[in-house]
Structures are given as C-alpha cells and as structure tokens.
C-alpha cells in the first residue's frame, strides 16, 4: 500500500515536468522553425 501512495504522489509531479518539457520544446522548435509543424502541400 505504501508503494501505491508513493506512486500517486510522484506521478502527477513527473507528468507535470514531462508535459512542461514537451510544451517548452515545441514552443522553442516553433520559434526557430515557424512552419515546421505545418505539413508541406503536395
């Protein structure tokens, strides 16, 4: 039971850090390459 409580207290922190890192990288990539997220028209 202690492991479950530890997981439930650590998981939101790890998820927040991961999504913060992901969003930050996407913003920085989009800043340097503004059209990289748009698929080129064929």
From Swiss-Prot:
Q: Name one GO cellular component term.
A: plastid membrane
List the transmembrane segments. 7-27
The residues forming the signal peptide are: none
Keyword annotations for this protein, in alphabetical order, are:
Membrane, Plastid, Transmembrane, Transmembrane helix
A Pfam family of the record is PSI_PsaJ
Q: Is Transmembrane set as a keyword in this record?
A: yes
DNA damage in keyword set: no
Bilayer topology annotation: Single-pass membrane protein
Subcellular location(s) per record:
Plastid membrane
The similarity annotation says: Belongs to the PsaJ family.
Q: What does this protein do?
A: May help in the organization of the PsaE and PsaF subunits.
Question: What's the protein called, per UniProt?
Answer: Photosystem I reaction center subunit IX
From which source organism is this entry? Aneura mirabilis (Parasitic liverwort)
């Amino acid at each position: 039971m202690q492991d479950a409580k530890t997981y439930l207290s650590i998981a939101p922190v790890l998820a927040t850090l991961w999504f913060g890192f992901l969003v930050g990288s996407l913003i920085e990539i989009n800043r340097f390459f503004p059209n990289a997220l748009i698929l080129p028209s064929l």
